[in-house]
Design a protein with these regions (language model features):
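Core residues of bacterial helix-turn-helix
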Residues: 35-36, 85-86, 97
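An amphipathic alpha-helical interaction segment
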Residues: 1-14, 30, 35-38, 42-44
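Short hydrophobic/aromatic patch on the recognition helix
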Residues: 42-43, 47, 92-93, 97
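Terminal helix-turn-helix DNA-binding modules in bacterial transcription factors
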Residues: 13-21, 26-30, 49-89, 110-138
Length: 138
């Protein structure tokens, strides 16, 4: 999500890569800015200009996207998924997930579980193997 069609600053690319790799860890704005050798104010300004989102909103969206992926694994409990995605509170996770997706995590899982089950079944039955697609879980 880049604004104005400008090339993304290396600082922002590094910050986004760090967030992607550490979304489950507590990530502080001051910590990120310091690691980029800039003030918190400057980092916030540049991050918002580049992504169109505040640092906190961007981090929340990354965590919700990770949670959406994890919700496809029907063996994981929603509470475990919340913590795996980086949320410190199940209540906060539920509230934010609903605000960003329009539905609660359980409903999201239910609405998408048929797709997840079909993919799992097709991999187990070898239906994708004939098309050159193999399961990485095997």
């Amino acid at each position: 999500m880049q604004q104005d069609g400008q090339a993304e600053e290396p600082m922002i690319r590094r910050a986004k890569a760090y967030i992607a790799g550490h979304h489950a860890d507590p990530i502080g704005l001051d910590e990120i800015a310091r690691s980029m050798h800039v003030s918190t104010f400057y980092f916030c300004k540049m991050f918002k200009k580049s992504t169109g989102l505040t640092f906190t909103d961007y981090l929340s969206r990354v965590r919700v996207e990770k949670a959406k992926d994890l919700l496809m694994n029907l063996r994981l409990r929603v509470s475990d998924i919340a913590y795996m995605a980086g949320f410190q509170s199940l209540t906060h996770f539920n509230r934010l997930f609903r605000r960003l997706t329009g539905e609660c995590p359980t409903r999201f899982r239910d609405n998408n579980s048929n797709r997840a089950n079909a993919l799992e079944t097709n991999f187990k039955d070898g239906r994708f193997a004939s098309k050159g697609i193999v399961s990485l879980a095997a």
